[in-house]
């Protein structure tokens, strides 16, 4: 038997360019519509689990209704908290720009002021992932979540170094993207990742 995990990143948000971690900003109408375009690929899903942040939860509720599935939320699927710079438009950041630049160059070495460390974020997400794959709860699970969460899961599945800046600088997880991970249920199975 194979287990499918569809990782959906929320659509584009209603806000200026910024690091939106724990800031609970709404998804834009166009972003929601773009995410909803995946609903046919999700047919046959057995459950939907969403980040509790409204940019994910709004679309997850609509998907759950369309697919006639129960929706649950998991705080562990929330984006990394970016501390004092969370939700601040980039155009408004002046004095703290060097801190932001250092974070972008090496996020595992430079935690933003008041932020969740990358190590804590990684441990939170990977802990959730390990629990959910140990008890799949059906053969097709949809996770509506955030770009950072998806990167952490991909790094775990592929055995990549989650501290490497390349994971954050070179792996693009677009808004409203669908990443499908298939795990076969036998000891020597190799996970397969598809970007749809």
Regions found by a protein language model. Name each.
Residues 1-4, 80-92, 137, 155-196:
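Acidic, low-complexity terminal tails and accessory targeting/binding regions
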Residues 5, 137-148:
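Generic beta-sheet signal
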Residues 42-44, 132-139:
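Glycine-rich phosphate-binding loop signature in dinucleotide/nucleotide-binding domains
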Residues 147-151, 177:
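GST superfamily/GST-like fold recognition
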Residues 65-127:
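Phosphate-handling substructures
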Residues 4, 8-69:
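Active-site-proximal alpha-helix that buttresses catalytic centers in soluble enzyme cores
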Residues 50-51, 123, 144-145:
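Short beta-strand scaffold positions
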């Amino acid at each position: 038997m194979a287990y499918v995990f569809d990782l959906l990143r929320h659509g584009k948000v209603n806000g200026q360019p910024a690091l939106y971690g724990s800031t609970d900003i709404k998804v834009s109408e166009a972003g929601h519509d773009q995410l909803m375009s995946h609903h046919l690929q999700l047919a046959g899903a057995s459950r939907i689990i969403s980040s509790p942040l409204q940019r994910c939860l709004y679309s997850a509720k609509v998907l759950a209704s369309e697919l006639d599935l129960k929706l649950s939320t998991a705080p562990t699927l929330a984006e990394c908290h970016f501390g004092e710079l969370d939700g601040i438009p980039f155009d408004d950041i002046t004095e703290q720009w060097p801190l932001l630049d250092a974070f972008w160059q090496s996020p595992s070495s430079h935690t933003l002021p008041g932020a969740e460390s990358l190590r804590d974020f990684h441990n939170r997400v990977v802990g959730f992932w390990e629990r959910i794959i140990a008890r799949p709860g059906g053969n097709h699970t949809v996770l509506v979540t955030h770009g950072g969460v998806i990167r952490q899961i991909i790094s775990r599945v592929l055995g990549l170094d989650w501290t490497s800046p390349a994971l954050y600088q070179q792996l693009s997880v677009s808004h409203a993207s669908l990443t499908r991970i298939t795990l076969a249920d036998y000891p020597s199975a190799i996970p397969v990742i598809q970007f749809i």
